[in-house]
């Protein structure tokens, strides 16, 4: 839509909204626009109304019926409708969602997206398309649903020089790990999450860390002003976290959480998602169940934490509507650059990443095993901060908390330790997050 088109619609009270998708989120967006229409009009001077919604099946029963003539299976009809001024993409997936968003931007229609995979993987191309067309592409709902972290980073903290982002950004895995603290296996906790609707029938994207990795790629890109792609994120899921690890964390005054960690130091960026031991004194340790939290650290802010529901139809819809209101309030073109990227930064080699670590070793209970393992750690400048040893029928479990070291040095030491004939299982290691440097 040209600037003349925007001036035309701004002369009227009603703004036409198109929806790509009318499932749980899409119907919730429409519900909010209808039920909160007066509040939106007071804030923007405009009433937002859904004109068309693209669906696969117009006959399907809907939890919030959109009205006669709104549902369509014809994308071109939505794209070319002059009464549609802004479009919300809430269908998910890469295709056809990506193709539709590109065509809408090319047609001059601002787009709001809740699609983390699309923004994380194809964001550079989409932002370039939006900029060329002179319209906005907003994506608050793609990360942490009701937590307005993208807006905070892009607007409120624009001069904060944020250099670290820590986050629990996947509610499914946080629910599973929280339930495992109360007893039970990973499989039992996953089954409960599925029964309650927190986990999909196929939970792979969640439990593998892929969902969280896409969100962290977006957050790191916005926070650091440099493109971080999904493929740049080091990723490890929670599938191999066992009740014994959760119990060991509790004994050490910690909890296990799937944590996203993005760091900018020395001109290099590292972004990763993996289970971690989190000290109970740390703010993220208190994030329970399906909730999300994002901690931002920067020169001008020290540290702030945003917490709230990270998923759900109405929560995601709330973020979509907030972006729609922002688009309308800034006349569609906006005062911010679409793309947050303004510089190129190097990627930190994964082996150079530094942290404290927890290591779990299962060995035969024989003289000298602990000393031998300690010597291998020391040979790689890895020192032990805390040790717990448990004996059971000729076997020993060693729980080690290590001072900060590089991942490369620790990995080299553990590879050597794994070759010991006394080692009964492969060493298991997770980073440790505390309020202090170990």
Question: Model regions: which residues?
Answer:
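N-terminal glycine-/serine-/threonine-rich beta1-alpha1-beta2 phosphate-ribose binding loop
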Residues: 2-107
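Rossmann-fold NAD(P)-binding glycine/threonine-rich loop
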Residues: 96-107, 116-154
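A short hydrophobic/small-residue beta-strand
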Residues: 110-112, 384
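Rossmann-like NAD(P)H-binding beta-loop-alpha module
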Residues: 131-211, 218
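Substrate-binding/catalytic subdomain of NAD(P)-dependent oxidoreductase enzymes
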Residues: 179-180, 188-286, 291-293
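Glycine-rich phosphate/pyrophosphate-binding beta-alpha loops
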Residues: 238, 280, 302-304, 308-314
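Low-complexity, glycine/alanine/valine/leucine- and proline-rich hydrophobic stretches
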Residues: 274-299, 313-314, 378-393
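A conserved regulatory-domain signal marking ACT and ACT-like small-molecule sensing domains
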Residues: 319, 324-438
